[in-house]
């Protein structure tokens, strides 16, 4: 980017989505002590990973558990990471193997999280009985995921704030087109690689309207 005089980047920090996912886990875990099924104070979790080697998948996988442990909660992984579009089939196998030992499902994206939900529901979980509930968290804040959060079947997701990303692109473009400095009169800042980083937003039922507003 530095080699181009008139080029800037608007986007996010991949690791932040994992941190925000971890924030949701910490907040909801502390608010729901019954989720600690064996009472050991440790989150026994499974994780559905995206494409191996992809920066977003790697960052989300690393940072979700890093954030949780840095906030005083121990974790124990019950599975190897999986790259799969067949999330339901994989979670079916995990449920059969681990059953009620699974206390949380972390997913690198919402599509796989919804596949996990299909799996647990087919086995009697997440259907309104609080004693048979496995919390699930994803990333992307797609409409189907938001609907499940409102139903109470999914705990949360992470919004990539496309609305504010678009605003940043427009603001910088208009300034440059009018011969101004790219940031003049805007709320944005540039990092050391000429990038505007728009923060991710953790989404739960408490602030779901924030995500829904991006689709209006």
Question: Model-flagged regions — what are they?
Answer:
Residues 4-6, 42-44, 69-75, 99-103, ...:
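Loop/turn elements at helix/coil->beta-strand transitions in domains of secreted/extracellular proteins
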Residues 25-33, 95, 170-181:
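Short, hydrophobic alpha-helical segments
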Residues 41-52, 56, 67-68, 166-216:
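Hinge/cleft segment of the Venus flytrap/periplasmic-binding protein
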Residues 64, 76-148:
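Hydrophobic alpha-helical
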Residues 108-117, 150, 160-178:
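Extracellular/periplasmic ligand-binding modules, especially the Venus flytrap/periplasmic-binding
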Residues 1-23, 27, 32-44, 142-150, ...:
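Flexible loop/hinge segments that line or gate small-molecule binding clefts
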Residues 17-24, 55-73, 90, 115-119:
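Short, solvent-exposed amphipathic alpha-helices that sit
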Residues 1-3, 15-16, 51-55, 81-85, ...:
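Solvent-exposed loop/turn segments at secondary-structure junctions
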């Amino acid at each position: 980017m530095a080699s181009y005089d008139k080029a800037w980047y608007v986007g996010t920090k991949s690791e932040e989505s994992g941190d925000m996912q971890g924030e949701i886990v910490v907040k909801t875990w502390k608010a729901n002590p019954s989720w600690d099924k064996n009472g050991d104070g440790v989150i026994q979790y499974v994780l559905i990973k995206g494409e191996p080697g992809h920066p977003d998948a790697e960052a989300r996988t690393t940072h979700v558990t890093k954030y949780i442990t840095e906030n005083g909660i121990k974790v124990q992984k019950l599975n190897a990471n999986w790259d799969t579009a067949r999330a339901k089939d994989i979670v079916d196998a995990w449920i059969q193997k681990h059953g009620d030992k699974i206390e949380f499902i972390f997913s690198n994206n919402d599509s796989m999280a919804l596949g996990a939900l299909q799996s647990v529901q087919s086995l009697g979980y997440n259907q309104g009985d609080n004693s048979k509930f496995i919390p699930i968290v994803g990333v992307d804040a797609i409409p189907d995921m938001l609907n499940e959060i409102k139903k109470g079947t999914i705990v949360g997701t992470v919004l990539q704030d496309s609305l504010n990303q678009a605003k940043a692109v427009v603001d910088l473009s208009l300034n440059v087109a009018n011969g101004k400095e790219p940031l003049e009169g805007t709320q944005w800042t540039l990092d050391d690689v000429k990038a505007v980083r728009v923060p991710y937003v953790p989404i739960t039922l408490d602030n779901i309207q924030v995500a829904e507003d991006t689709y209006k």
